[in-house]
């Protein structure tokens, strides 16, 4: 989940009547620490800087962690490691820029006498207050689209993962089942506190990442393993754009080391690891995490939709649930149409993450401080490792140009090409994407290694 997505998710903490409106009063109930036990305060009460880091860290990997080894097989080990570090640094920089813009917006508004007590500042408010309504609309459009497809990916990932515990049902059937389960999020009024979910999410993804790394090392390299590396530009840039999305190099490199080119046809890392209790535990934890992430991603979309149709003041939970169905049903439908776990991640990374995480924050920072007076009165000066404002502008310009050309341009071309190829190969509404081919009766007792997987 990107920093921009974190901003829209923050709207879940606002009062229901004012959700997603960049100019709302956004009041929330003041939490009284004396009303609960020390344990409940520790687990439930949020809102601190640490909670922001917990939330970002717990949502940063999610299901994309399982496709990073697939990306490494497209890139090769060296390029994979280099790009992980490179995009990790760029992502950290743009996250810093977003925090600077938040501070700047708050400082300017406080000078005007605005009180931010019990108010959750949203990313769209920041863009609106610093750069105008056009920027607010752009930010809202990109983030809502990102959340929409992020929710689709969670459903696809749920079906893909559970299949490796129970393959008696095909992935499309599992998508029906998990779509129905995730549709129950329409009954959730809002998320007032995130800390417990952040703890859980961080624990689940940490376990899965280390399971992938340790299980791959213990398994060792498969017989005749090959690490061909990049063979086609389409594959190379497809893998590179998936790394735009997240960070998890220790798991990805270990799985690629063990299985090599076999990952080119197995976008979900679980598919190659031996079935045992450790893997089943990782699958179950990821399923829970994906359900939580689906709720985090969908809830702000519900608020936007309620605002559009004028249902945001409705007190009835059932009426609001009915009003939210036009949001969740298309998400469910899209997950059934395009079940391409892996390729869809790269497409979302290239076409949406490029802007929400990298381009928009860097451009917004450049335009906010374009005048000498803005730089002179800035609430946050350049960091100690930046010698001047000019250096910051150069770095921001590099981020914009690099991501626009390499991430959105080449990455978008490669990801869309690969996505279309999956549609041509498997068709829409694919019953079981990358599942085992049926075993003919004559070879029913052949060794497991003789079974092959579809592309």
Annotate the PLM regions.
Residues 1-70, 91-96, 118-120, 430-433, ...:
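Membrane-interface "cap" regions at the ends of multi-pass membrane proteins
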Residues 69-113, 117:
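Extracellular loop-to-transmembrane helix junctions
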Residues 71, 184-189, 333-339:
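Hydrophobic alpha-helical transmembrane segments
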Residues 3-7, 44-45, 50, 102-143, ...:
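Membrane-interfacial loop- and helix-cap regions that link adjacent transmembrane helices
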Residues 49-66, 179, 242-249, 405-407:
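The first (N-terminal) embedded transmembrane alpha-helix
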Residues 66-71, 125-129:
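Generic transmembrane alpha-helix signature in multi-pass membrane proteins
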Residues 63, 88-100, 179-187:
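Central hydrophobic cores of alpha-helical transmembrane segments in multi-pass inner-membrane proteins
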Residues 67-77, 189-198, 250-254, 262-269:
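Hydrophobic, small-residue-rich membrane helices and short re-entrant helix-turn-helix hairpins
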């Amino acid at each position: 989940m990107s920093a921009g997505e974190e901003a829209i998710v923050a709207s879940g903490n606002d009062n229901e009547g004012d959700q997603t409106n960049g100019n709302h009063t956004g009041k929330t109930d003041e939490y009284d620490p004396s009303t609960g036990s020390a344990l409940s305060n520790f687990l439930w009460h949020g809102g601190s800087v640490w909670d922001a880091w917990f939330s970002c860290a717990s949502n940063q990997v999610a299901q994309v962690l399982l496709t990073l080894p697939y990306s490494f097989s497209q890139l090769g080990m060296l390029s994979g490691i280099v790009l992980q570090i490179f995009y990790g640094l760029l992502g950290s920089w743009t996250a810093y820029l977003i925090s600077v813009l938040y501070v700047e917006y708050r400082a300017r508004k406080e000078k005007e006498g605005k009180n931010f007590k019990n108010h959750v500042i949203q990313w769209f408010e920041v863009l609106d207050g610093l750069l105008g309504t056009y920027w607010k609309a752009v930010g809202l459009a990109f983030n809502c689209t990102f959340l929409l497809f992020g929710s689709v990916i969670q459903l696809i990932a749920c079906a893909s993962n559970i299949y490796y515990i129970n393959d008696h049902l095909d992935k499309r059937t599992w998508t029906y089942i998990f779509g129905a389960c995730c549709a129950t999020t329409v009954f959730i009024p809002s998320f007032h506190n995130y800390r417990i979910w952040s703890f859980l999410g961080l624990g689940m993804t940490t376990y899965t990442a280390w399971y992938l790394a340790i299980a791959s090392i213990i398994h060792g390299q498969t017989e005749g393993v090959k690490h061909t590396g990049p063979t086609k530009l389409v594959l190379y840039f497809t893998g590179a754009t998936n790394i735009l999305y997240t960070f998890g190099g220790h798991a990805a490199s270990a799985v690629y080391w063990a299985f090599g080119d076999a990952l080119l046809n197995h976008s979900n890392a679980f598919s190659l690891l031996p079935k045992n209790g450790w893997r089943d535990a990782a699958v179950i934890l990821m399923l829970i995490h994906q359900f939580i992430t689906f709720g985090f991603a969908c809830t702000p979309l519900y608020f936007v939709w309620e605002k559009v149709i004028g249902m945001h003041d409705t007190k009835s939970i059932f009426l609001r649930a009915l009003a939210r169905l036009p949001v969740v049903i298309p998400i469910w439908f899209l997950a059934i149409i395009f079940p391409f776990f892996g390729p869809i991640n790269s497409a979302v990374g290239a076409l949406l993450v490029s802007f929400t995480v990298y381009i928009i924050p860097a451009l917004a920072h450049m335009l906010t401080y374009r005048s000498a007076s803005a730089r002179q009165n800035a609430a946050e000066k350049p960091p100690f490792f930046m010698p001047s404002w000019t250096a910051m502008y150069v770095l921001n310009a590099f981020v914009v140009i690099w991501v626009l050309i390499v991430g959105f341009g080449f990455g978008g071309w490669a990801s869309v090409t690969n996505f279309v190829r999956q549609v041509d190969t498997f068709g829409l509404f694919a019953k079981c994407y990358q599942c085992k081919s049926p075993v003919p009766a004559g070879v029913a007792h052949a060794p497991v290694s003789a079974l092959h997987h579809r592309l």
